[in-house]
Regions:
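Short acidic/polar mixed-charge low-complexity motifs
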Residues: 95-97, 122, 134, 173-177
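Conserved hydrophobic positions within beta-strands
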Residues: 62, 100-103, 137
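Residue-level signal for inorganic ion chemistry
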Residues: 34, 60, 101, 126, ...
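Internal, well-ordered alpha-helical scaffold/interface segments
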Residues: 43, 75, 99-102, 124, ...
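RNA pseudouridine synthases
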Residues: 1-87, 92-95, 105-108, 151, ...
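Broad gene-expression machinery/nucleic-acid interaction feature
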Residues: 31, 57, 72, 98, ...
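Pseudouridine synthase
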Residues: 1-8, 39, 79, 105-168
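Short, acidic, Ser/Thr-enriched surface-loop or helix-capping motifs
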Residues: 91, 118, 171-172
Length: 210
């Protein structure tokens, strides 16, 4: 698939300026991606993220059940060379990375549906943080290895089960604008397999965060 940057000219429509990416998603992550139609709006949205006024929330299926059921992962990350390319790794001398999470549902001890809200925006942050607490995201062989896959006769896709579910940004007209993205097909099938119900998480943003 073409990188998103290569598609931006096609999203210009009648605007004089080329759209700008406000943030990025990992190559295999689905969901909401925010574009700015002008340099001015890009600057405003960038500041909204820096000030934590704008928020992003992700859904993931992880292998196992994290403990506690709700918490904050505060683990600094650093980029390191590795087999198959560079990887992010926990490193006290790295850049601070913080993720809030909570369990929505779990399938015994096999897997859990998590809501993840990154407080910082480091590369591969959610993937490394989930692996660091012993529950790698399903399909994330890069960080979870074989533990990121449910073996046997399971029909679960081997694709990454990480989805940018929603984004919340200031509305220039007042209040907040919230955009929700539907799950991709492979994750819909996994939800059905585990008998999870999307309606169980009616409020996608974590309101318990300090």
């Amino acid at each position: 698939a073409k990188h998103v940057d290569a598609l931006l000219d096609g999203l210009r429509f009648d605007a004089k300026e080329r759209p700008r990416l406000v943030h990025r998603l990992d190559k295999d992550t689905s969901g909401v991606l925010l574009l700015a139609r002008s340099a001015k709006s890009a600057a405003m949205l960038g500041e909204a993220f820096r000030s934590k006024e704008a928020r992003k929330v992700y859904w993931a299926i992880v292998a196992g059940v994290p403990r506690p059921a709700m918490g904050r992962i505060d683990l600094s990350l650093e980029k390191r060379p590795g087999r198959g390319g560079e990887k992010m790794a926990a490193d006290e001398e790295g850049k601070r990375a913080i993720t809030d999470y909570k369990i929505v549902a779990n399938a015994a001890r096999r897997a859990s549906w998590l809501v993840l809200e990154p407080v910082t925006g480091r590369t591969h942050q959610l993937r490394v943080h989930c692996q660091a607490i012993g529950t790698p995201i399903l399909g994330d062989g890069k960080y979870g290895g074989k533990d990121a896959f449910i073996e046997g006769d399971s029909p679960i896709s081997r694709n990454l089960h990480l989805h940018a579910r929603g984004i919340q940004i200031p509305n220039p007209g007042g209040g907040m604008l919230e955009v929700i993205a539907p799950l991709p097909e492979h994750m819909v099938k996994t939800w059905r397999y585990f008998e999870f119900d999307e309606r169980d998480e009616a409020e996608p943003f974590l309101e318990w965060r300090e």
